[in-house]
Regions:
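Individual alpha-helical transmembrane segments in multi-pass integral membrane proteins
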Residues: 1-16, 28-125, 135-138
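Alpha-helical transmembrane segments
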Residues: 17-23
Length: 138
């Protein structure tokens, strides 16, 4: 039972990875949308696999590295969603460009959230877990 979250997240990561690759072979989508869906699926896979493995490890340092990988997926997913929504909704090019540029603020936030001082790791009831420390970013 301790590995329930790990198994579920790893399965979701594999499915998202498959979905990402399969999206490239879809014949009816525009080329740009195919690639945006690919990046969305790939980011989701990285997010799920990073946090899925985090629950299974018993070392705080490895858990920290898994969280860093998982957070790459989180921010990649959010950036991909903004790009995809702008494309699908047919927003004017100027508005899309503003939102696309602003979405990369997440990259700066990422580097603030993955600092080792921003979280502490411990073995909980369901496996390794973490808590965030209070600070400007958290």
């Amino acid at each position: 039972m301790n590995y329930l979250f790990t198994v579920l997240l790893v399965i979701e990561g594999v499915v998202a990875g498959y979905w990402a690759i399969a999206s490239l072979f879809h014949k009816e989508r525009k080329r740009k949308i195919k690639w945006l869906i690919f990046w969305l699926g790939l980011s989701s896979a990285v997010w799920s696999l990073g946090f899925g493995v985090l629950f299974a490890v018993d070392s705080a340092m490895i858990a920290y590295l898994c969280r860093c990988v998982g957070m790459v997926g989180v921010f990649g997913y959010l950036i991909s969603i903004l790009f995809l929504l702008g494309e699908v909704c047919g927003a004017p090019k100027k508005i899309r460009t503003v939102f696309e540029i602003l979405s990369f603020v997440g990259v700066a936030i990422y580097f603030g959230t993955v600092l080792p001082s921003q979280s502490s790791y411990y073995i909980g009831r369901w496996g390794m877990t973490y808590s965030l420390t209070s600070g400007v970013i958290n």
